[in-house]
Amino acid sequence: MIKKLASFIFHSLGWKSVGEVPSDIKKYIIIGAPHTSNWDFFYGILFFLMKGIPLKFFIKKEWYFFPFNILLKSLGGIPVDRSKKENLTDQIADFFNQHEKLAILITPEGTRSYNPQWKKGFYYISQKTKAP
């Protein structure tokens, strides 16, 4: 019921999902684009619910404050510190490699503003983790 409702809302809002994840793949990266609004977070949740995928997403630690931190954690949010010397792709790759089964959503533009040039972090994470 949740999948059907999420799918109905997702498609009613004009979004589409391209491709399917083979059931034998335990770890993978999902690209969410374009990321031009804070509403994209809501669309991402709908996508994961529609596909029956346990939600995990990375979000800058600045968003982790009370009471939002409780909501974000319950939704699968993982805070990242972008000021650390270790770059973000390494932090995400390390997290990814610590889990046997994991799907993560990455928005490759690197900003909510329109940006036709994608950053390459998702590619480097895929290479470091050998995840499709």
What residue spans do the PLM features occupy?
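Helix-enriched interaction subdomains in cytosolic or periplasmic regions
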Residues: 1-3
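Soluble catalytic domains of membrane acyltransferases
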Residues: 10-132
